[in-house]
Structure formats: structure tokens, C-alpha cells
């Protein structure tokens, strides 16, 4: 069973081909350099660049897999969430291929894809407790199968990735700022700057707007007083505050839902502190099937969509 998957929800256009649960190729066309000058992703530019890039990405994926397009059995693509223009390009490419080779097409969820991207090299044992962290999402999910996802907590305002990027921008760091803050934090003192501790209420929801505002106000106040900001210490203080609440909420979820697998997914799953938290909690609560995704599967890629499609088709064929 060969599946060709397309991921185009933001500023990456990616095509992956999977053959019976083995990833044959995962080609990614990244636009980071094109958007850096603007300090963030420009939706119209992202969609136009997808149009320019999809042809060579498709050719490269087929060439690397040593396959002809007619040998593909299923087409899968990201339907949502994401930038509308970018999603439409991926959908059009997927539908065109599907019509051309007369093969079934699957429209899949981007976040569910991220979750199953974590299982590419480590198979899930259900139930799965997944921490989803990205530019647009901060949520905890319980997964019982490729068709059974339960969101038990989500962001009420800003997502953690958005908070990272906005704080980095105010500090004068380049885009994307999250990875830069993470690297700086490794060398800093988390107790150097005083930031408000995020509230741990009785829910599994998250809120990062208060932390974002507090950071921006502190930076502006220090600048007005002409006090030098130690970037490493600021990053460490910010990162500790941003991730500490994740550890608390996850620990509570582990006690309540008793998962057999613990993992993390989404672009911010590349964050060093969050990865440490996942592994630490897995060890503390003896969840033997605890793992973090390979770094190349953290950011947007089509391999995660291919894996989700494979698991959904497998489940359907068993029924």
C-alpha cells in the first residue's frame, strides 16, 4: 500500500511517500528565508511560493522513491487548520493527482498529523497522552485510535509558539525566534528575571497572553531605564515560566488518564525543555512507551500526514 501525502498548511510545501508503514521519502520545501525579512509568515507569499515549488517537490519525491505516479494507491493531504491560501494549493495538487491516476483521496487534520508524526519511529500503545505545542496550538489530547482523538485542554488565547516568537521579536531576535530563545536559555539563569507564574487552575487549558504581555512590558521598562538586557538570562527565565505550567498540567493528566504512551507533537516539540519534561514525566510515572519525535518530524512535513493516512486506512480495512 503506497500513499502519497501532501502538507502545505503554512510556509512549507512537503510531499512524502509511505509504503506499508515505511517512509520512502519526505521532501520539504521551506520558505523561512523568504519570510525572515518580514519578521513572520506572509500568507499570500506562502501560497504563491507553494505554486512555484510543488512541481519540483513532486518530481523529487517520486524520483527518490523510484516510483511512477501510477503506482500510488492513495493520496492524502492536509485540509485544516492552516493558512487558507496555502491549504488550497495542497488540496488542488492532491485532487489533480487523484483524478489523474483515479485513486482515493483522504483529507486529513494537520494537528492529528503532528501527533502521528511522533509515531513514525515509535509505535503507539493506546491510550496515548499527547502534548501538542505549536505556533497556533497548545493542547493536551487523549488518543485511542487513528479515528479517536479527545482534546482535554487547549489554549484560551495565545499559543506557546506564538508567545515565543512575539517575545523574541520584541527582544530584537530574528524570525523564527522560538529556537533562538531555546538556545539562549540553555546558557542563562532562570531566576534572574521575575516573571508571573502561569496559573494552574482545575482545567487542562493554557493561557500565554499574560506571560507575553508581562515580558513585553518588562523589556520596554528596562529599555526606558537604559538597562542592558541579558538575553541568555531573559530567555532562561521566560522558558522556565512558559514550560513549567506544561509540566504541571501533564502530570495531572497522567494521574487522571493513566496513558500507556506519552509523547509530544508540533513545531515547538523541538524545544529542549519540553522534550526533557516529557522524558522526565515518563520515567517518573513508569510509562515505558514514552518518547519525543525525531527533530526532522517536529516541524511541518508530509511524512506525518502519510503516517496518519496509513493508520486510518489500516483501521478501516480491519472493520
Swiss-Prot record:
GO function terms (MF aspect): iron ion binding; N(6)-L-threonylcarbamoyladenine synthase activity
Cell compartment(s), UniProt: Cytoplasm
Cofactor note: Binds 1 Fe(2+) ion per subunit.
CDD domains, sorted: ASKHA_NBD_TsaD_bac
Short name of any one Pfam family annotated for the protein: TsaD
Keyword Cytoplasm listed: yes
Catalytic activity: L-threonylcarbamoyladenylate + adenosine(37) in tRNA = N(6)-L-threonylcarbamoyladenosine(37) in tRNA + AMP + H(+)
EC number per UniProt: 2.3.1.234
Binding residues for Fe cation: 110, 114, 300
SUPFAM superfamilies according to UniProt: Actin-like ATPase domain
Function field: Required for the formation of a threonylcarbamoyl group on adenosine at position 37 (t(6)A37) in tRNAs that read codons beginning with adenine. Is involved in the transfer of the threonylcarbamoyl moiety of threonylcarbamoyl-AMP (TC-AMP) to the N6 group of A37, together with TsaE and TsaB. TsaD likely plays a direct catalytic role in this reaction.
Family under the similarity heading: Belongs to the KAE1 / TsaD family.
Protein name: tRNA N6-adenosine threonylcarbamoyltransferase
Source species of the chain: Mycoplasma capricolum subsp. capricolum (strain California kid / ATCC 27343 / NCTC 10154)
Lineage, uppermost ranks: Bacteria, Bacillati, Mycoplasmatota, Mollicutes, Mycoplasmataceae
Amino acid at each position: 500500500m503506497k500513499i502519497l501525502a501532501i502538507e502545505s498548511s503554512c510556509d512549507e510545501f512537503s510531499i512524502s511517500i509511505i509504503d506499508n508503514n515505511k517512509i520512502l521519502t519526505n521532501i520539504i520545501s521551506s520558505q523561512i528565508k523568504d519570510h525572515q525579512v518580514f519578521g513572520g509568515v506572509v500568507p499570500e507569499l506562502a501560497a504563491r511560493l507553494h505554486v512555484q515549488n510543488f512541481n519540483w517537490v513532486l518530481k523529487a519525491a517520486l524520483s527518490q522513491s523510484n516510483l511512477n505516479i501510477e503506482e500510488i494507491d492513495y493520496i492524502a493531504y492536509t485540509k485544516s487548520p492552516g493558512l487558507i491560501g496555502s491549504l488550497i494549493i495542497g488540496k488542488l495538487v492532491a485532487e489533480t493527482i487523484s483524478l489523474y491516476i483515479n485513486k482515493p483521496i483522504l483529507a486529513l487534520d494537520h494537528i492529528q498529523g503532528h501527533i502521528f508524526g511522533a509515531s513514525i519511529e515509535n509505535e503507539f500503545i493506546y491510550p496515548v497522552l499527547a502534548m501538542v505545542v505549536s505556533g497556533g496550538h497548545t493542547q493536551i489530547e487523549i488518543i485511542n485510535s487513528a479515528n479517536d482523538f479527545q482534546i482535554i485542554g487547549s489554549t484560551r488565547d495565545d499559543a506557546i509558539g506564538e508567545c515565543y516568537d512575539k517575545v523574541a521579536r520584541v527582544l530584537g531576535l530574528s524570525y523564527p525566534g522560538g529556537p533562538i530563545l531555546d538556545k539562549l536559555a540553555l546558557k542563562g539563569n532562570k531566576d534572574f528575571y521575575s516573571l508571573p507564574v502561569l496559573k494552574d487552575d482545575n482545567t487542562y487549558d493554557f493561557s500565554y497572553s499574560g506571560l507575553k504581555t508581562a515580558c513585553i512590558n518588562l523589556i520596554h521598562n528596562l529599555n526606558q531605564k537604559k538597562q542592558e538586557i541579558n538575553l541568555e538570562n531573559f530567555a532562561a527565565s521566560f522558558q522556565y515560566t512558559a514550560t513549567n505550567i506544561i509540566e504541571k498540567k501533564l502530570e495531572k493528566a497522567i494521574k487522571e488518564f493513566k496513558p500507556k504512551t506519552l509523547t509530544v507533537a508540533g513545531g515547538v516539540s523541538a524545544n529542549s525543555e519540553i522534550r526533557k519534561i516529557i522524558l522526565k514525566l515518563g520515567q517518573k510515572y513508569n510509562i515505558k512507551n514514552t518518547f519525543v519525535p525525531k527533530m526532522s518530524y517536529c516541524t511541518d512535513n508530509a511524512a506525518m500526514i502519510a503516517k496518519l493516512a496509513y493508520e486510518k486506512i489500516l483501521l478501516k480495512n480491519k472493520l
